[in-house]
Amino acid sequence: MATNTVNGVLVCSDGTNIPLKEELAEGTESDLKTDTVYTVSAMNVGDYAPGKTVVSALVSCDNGVGFCYILSQGLVAAIIPWSVKGAVSDGTPALCQPYTLKAGDIVRCMNNTAADREAAIACYTASGVSRIFKVTPTGGATNELVDLQTGNSIGDTLQGQRITKWFGTSVDGSKIETQGFYVVDALGNVVGSCSATNPIVQQPLFSFAATNIALNYKAQFLTNS
């Protein structure tokens, strides 16, 4: 696969900006390290600025983007807002809550082609948990988004928690036959909905939610092709 230049910045509470830049392969989740033009050597963010508290951030890819987050001790520690270059309307958005970097923390990014249909929901709960759910549709179907780390459903992953902020991304546009992404209960009733933004056209932004999650709940959307 081709590689593209992915850029980003993490803005810290003390005014420090951490510039990010890396040539990342399309279709492969990869580490996004610091920009050597400004930081001398390419480093993971936790090793470059341990103890700094990130309050806002943005990562931009050339053609398409699946998701981006800070990985800490094997878990999604913070969701980093993502976009395609030029499709930015809200500058560097605030994180759902400030996050203090630890040694070993890594920024992970999925750099995609423009044609890649990977869809994602970024969720933040009332208890401070951040998770990302994803799926790549291949035709007309009901597509379930599953946890990017475990492959589990939203019900298995966030059972007993309440989603308070989320956003969704998909390039499918008119192929989508639901109002964005739905969360359905065990009986198939819609209990939550999250709009789907095309990150090639518009920067996705978090919206407020109040969606309680229980066992056997699913996140899904319908496509016609």
What positions do the PLM features span?
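Beta-strand-centric surfaces of beta-sandwich/beta-rich domains
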Residues: 1-225
